[in-house]
Amino acid sequence: MNTERTLVLIKPDGVRRGLIGEIISRFERKGLKIKALKMLRLTREKAEEFYSVHRGKPFFVSLIEFMTSGPIIAMILEGDMAISVVRRMIGPTDGREAPPGTIRGDYSLSKSQNVVHASDSPESAMREIRVIFKDDEIIDW
């Protein structure tokens, strides 16, 4: 078994549309364990730190504006190959191209407002978790 942790964000559009419970339920039903969960509003500084890998790209400013436009849900999920499992569950970035049955395929018609974010590698997961969560907010059980 290759137990991993990954970070998932339910973005402001997902929160606004009342999709929190549905999205969390999908991950739980898959067998992923929630290690941390909170609602927060990203500051501009925190959003820029989180998305620093995209700094300088044409969409960076609009991404930061979107991610700071309302509350988000942040969670750490753990399970066997959690990173790739979650990535398959959420689907491709562009909701218009995401297959039905994936979170983005079922709930997004956009590339920019695509309901969820998930870490794409173990290194990204570690960095992103450190940006969003303090050590004492992560529960081992």
From Swiss-Prot:
Localization of this protein: Cytoplasm
GO cellular component: cytoplasm
Biological process per Gene Ontology, one example term: GTP biosynthetic process
Record-listed E.C. numbers: 2.7.4.6
Matching Pfam families: NDK
Broad EC category: transferase
Active-site residues per Swiss-Prot or TrEMBL entry: H117
Gene Ontology molecular-function annotations: ATP binding; metal ion binding; nucleoside diphosphate kinase activity
Superkingdom of this protein's organism: Archaea
Cofactor or coenzyme needed: Mg(2+)
Alphabetical list of InterPro entries matching this protein: NDK-like_dom, NDK-like_dom_sf, Nucleoside_diP_kinase, Nucleoside_diP_kinase_AS
Residues reported in the UniProt entry to bind ATP: K11, F59, R87, T93, R104, N114
Catalyzed reaction equations: a 2'-deoxyribonucleoside 5'-diphosphate + ATP = a 2'-deoxyribonucleoside 5'-triphosphate + ADP; a ribonucleoside 5'-diphosphate + ATP = a ribonucleoside 5'-triphosphate + ADP
Keyword tags: ATP-binding, Cytoplasm, Kinase, Magnesium, Metal-binding, Nucleotide metabolism, Nucleotide-binding, Phosphoprotein, Transferase
Role description: Major role in the synthesis of nucleoside triphosphates other than ATP. The ATP gamma phosphate is transferred to the NDP beta phosphate via a ping-pong mechanism, using a phosphorylated active-site intermediate.
Protein name: Nucleoside diphosphate kinase
